[in-house]
Amino acid sequence: MKRINALTIAGTDPSGGAGIQADLKTFSALGAYGCSVITALVAQNTRGVQSVYRIEPDFVAAQLDSVFSDVRIDTTKIGMLAETDIVEAVAERLQRYQIQNVVLDTVMLAKSGDPLLSPSAVATLRSRLLPQVSLITPNLPEAAALLDAPHARTEQEMLEQGRSLLAMGCGAVLMKGGHLDDEQSPDWLFTREGEQRFTAPRIMTKNTHGTGCTLSAALAALRPRHTNWADTVQEAKSWLSSALAQADTLEVGHGIGPVHHFHAWW
């Protein structure tokens, strides 16, 4: 079986629970070789974001050229893009190199509530990047921001917003329902072929730092092994549930700790 080369395009987390660091751990845990392009240096920890240093868009583009001109990339995950010019740089390079299997984690807020994407960049992400990606993974606040609509409060509203996002041109949408007041924490997958509901019991832990990054990276790493998104989502969610179930064993930081990416090994 061909080895999978996976790329993450995202910001950093020096505490290791989110961003590039979480993505590379996820790739390794799921048997993919990880490459990375850094969009922002983020001073953050389990308590929140202290500072963000955005990488110059030209240097983001140069990193992408370095990877795409040399390494066969089978799958890509995009996370924090920070600002409009970086969104433009990434969109242009994806188009230039005809990159396939792209998962976009529509990162706008950190778990702590700190902003990670400027408001002006949302419109550019919507118009330039969404039509090029295979899957987007918004939570309910992110979906509302993309649609410039109120936050979905019911599962029916969540369904309506997922369909609206799919109509914006991306290949598929995984709407994450963790913000709903529902014990099952339903997620909905929207594709051109249909819709599917996924549920999993809520795992009682405060240590959920980087779950969005980790899920989107898992979806990217696993997609080349499956023929459809439904099977990919099922495996990724199952793996993440195990990582969450073991999160409390890590004892990292004094705030919202990370999930255990390597729960299968130690």
UniProtKB/Swiss-Prot annotation:
The keyword Nucleotide-binding applies. Catalyzes the phosphorylation of hydroxymethylpyrimidine phosphate (HMP-P) to HMP-PP, and of HMP to HMP-P. Shows no activity with pyridoxal, pyridoxamine or pyridoxine. SUPFAM superfamilies: Ribokinase-like. The gene is thiD. It comes from Escherichia coli (strain K12). Keywords: ATP-binding, Kinase, Nucleotide-binding, Thiamine biosynthesis, Transferase. It is an enzyme of class 2 (transferase). 4-amino-5-hydroxymethyl-2-methylpyrimidine binds at Q44. Pfam families: Phos_pyr_kin. CDD domains: HMPP_kinase. GO terms for biological process: thiamine biosynthetic process; thiamine diphosphate biosynthetic process; thiamine salvage. One of its GO terms (cellular component) is cytosol. Belongs to the ThiD family. This is Hydroxymethylpyrimidine/phosphomethylpyrimidine kinase. Its EC number is 2.7.1.49, 2.7.4.7. It comes from the Bacteria. InterPro entries: HMP/HMP-P_kinase_dom, PM/HMP-P_kinase-1, Ribokinase-like. GO terms for molecular function: ATP binding; hydroxymethylpyrimidine kinase activity; phosphomethylpyrimidine kinase activity. It catalyses: 4-amino-5-hydroxymethyl-2-methylpyrimidine + ATP = 4-amino-2-methyl-5-(phosphooxymethyl)pyrimidine + ADP + H(+); 4-amino-2-methyl-5-(phosphooxymethyl)pyrimidine + ATP = 4-amino-2-methyl-5-(diphosphooxymethyl)pyrimidine + ADP. Monomer.
